[in-house]
Regions:
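A compositional/biophysical signature of low hydrophobicity enriched in polar/charged and small residues
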Residues: 1-107
């Protein structure tokens, strides 16, 4: 199943709600991800531009997009960024295909 990096930044309202009532939001979102056929592989809270970082497996880009839209529509997030990930073997295969594409950069 494809892997995705999801980076989530909470809105001010989202942080206010979490400070008022601290809770494990990873466990709160797990059922929604699983309902779409996905699985949380790992999750962390983070400092910086994004507050939560997830590595998830989702059946397809459509499913990964659906959960990102659901997160964004909930109102607690100011940003949701989803990045498709390649395994090392997939990346090597992509490199081999790139070599065979005969693409030439402009001179």
């Amino acid at each position: 199943m494809p892997h995705y990096l999801q980076q989530i930044a909470y809105s001010i309202e989202g942080w206010k709600a979490l400070v008022k009532k601290p809770q494990n939001r990873i466990e709160a979102v797990r059922p929604a991800i699983e309902k779409l056929g996905g699985k949380i592989e790992s999750a962390w809270f983070a400092f910086g531009d994004y507050d939560v970082v997830l590595i998830v497996q989702m059946p397809s880009n459509v499913d990964a997009g659906a959960i990102a839209i659901a997160f964004a529509a909930g109102g607690a997030c100011k940003a949701v960024k989803t990045t498709p990930l390649l395994t090392v073997d997939e990346a090597v295969e992509a490199m081999k295909k790139a070599a065979g594409s005969e693409y030439r950069a402009p001179h």
